């Protein structure tokens, strides 16, 4: 059952531009925190669609049929200036549908930081879901020019969702997942917003010399280009279950 779990930095909203940030759970909090740190002066409404979580093991057709109607409903209710799809899988699956319906400048997607990675290293390790990998247009545009390795895991996002506050469980799972890539010379792309929440844990396992990249800052930069930045605190409302509030309390100051 959805609930208003948290209100952060609340101030007079009549002066703020509203942004709807959408994810299946806690992953998109990485983007919310980045926007808050930029002091964009935005009214951020974060919607955690736990009813349909996780997205990572769903097909494009399933996401279109089940998630798109929910997005349309919330857009109509909340009237945001823009919506941020804070999920690589959802972006790869439905971003074109939403842009066709609402316009190019209404929808900001989240995509793996493949292009920035290619400027650093032509050998890339992608951590993502199978649906993201299969439907990522940016990846298709550069794949022939890079040496790509991939870890396509459908369970890691759910593990982070469930065990964010239990580091031992998460570390054991990450260790098994990443053990073959310790001290790798490849650039490592975190192709899921959930993974950004445990970026430091991934870094510790792979080694301090391994370059990690994700799309968080790119999303923030686009939001700022579209809506501006007035050096004021953001207001943040979280709509989701208690876990979203709990993770935000820990992650926002990490």
Regions found by a protein language model. Name each.
Residues 4-254:
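Non-catalytic structural scaffold of enzyme domains
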């Amino acid at each position: 059952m959805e609930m208003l779990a948290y209100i952060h930095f609340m101030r007079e909203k009549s002066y703020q531009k509203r942004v709807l940030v959408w994810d299946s759970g806690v992953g998109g909090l990485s983007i919310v925190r980045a926007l808050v740190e930029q002091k964009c002066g935005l009214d951020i409404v974060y919607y955690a669609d736990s009813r349909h979580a996780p997205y990572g093991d769903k097909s494009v057709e399933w996401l279109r049929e089940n998630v798109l109607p929910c997005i349309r409903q919330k857009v109509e209710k909340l009237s945001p200036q823009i919506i941020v799809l804070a999920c690589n899988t959802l972006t790869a699956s439905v971003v074109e549908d939403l842009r066709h319906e609402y316009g190019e400048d209404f929808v900001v997607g989240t995509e793996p930081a493949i292009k920035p990675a290619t400027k650093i290293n032509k050998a890339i390790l992608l951590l993502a879901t199978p649906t993201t990998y299969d439907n990522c247009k940016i990846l298709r545009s550069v794949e022939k020019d890079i040496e790509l390795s991939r870890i396509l895991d459908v369970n890691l996002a759910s593990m982070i969702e469930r065990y964010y506050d239990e580091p031992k469980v998460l570390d054991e799972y990450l260790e098994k997942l990443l053990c073959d890539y310790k001290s790798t010379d490849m650039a490592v792309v975190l192709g899921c917003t959930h993974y950004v929440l445990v970026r430091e844990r991934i870094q510790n396992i792979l080694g301090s010399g391994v370059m990690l990249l994700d799309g968080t800052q790119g999303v923030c930069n686009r939001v700022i280009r579209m809506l501006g930045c007035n050096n004021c605190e953001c207001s943040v409302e979280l709509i989701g279950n208690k876990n979203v509030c709990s993770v935000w309390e820990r992650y926002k100051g990490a």
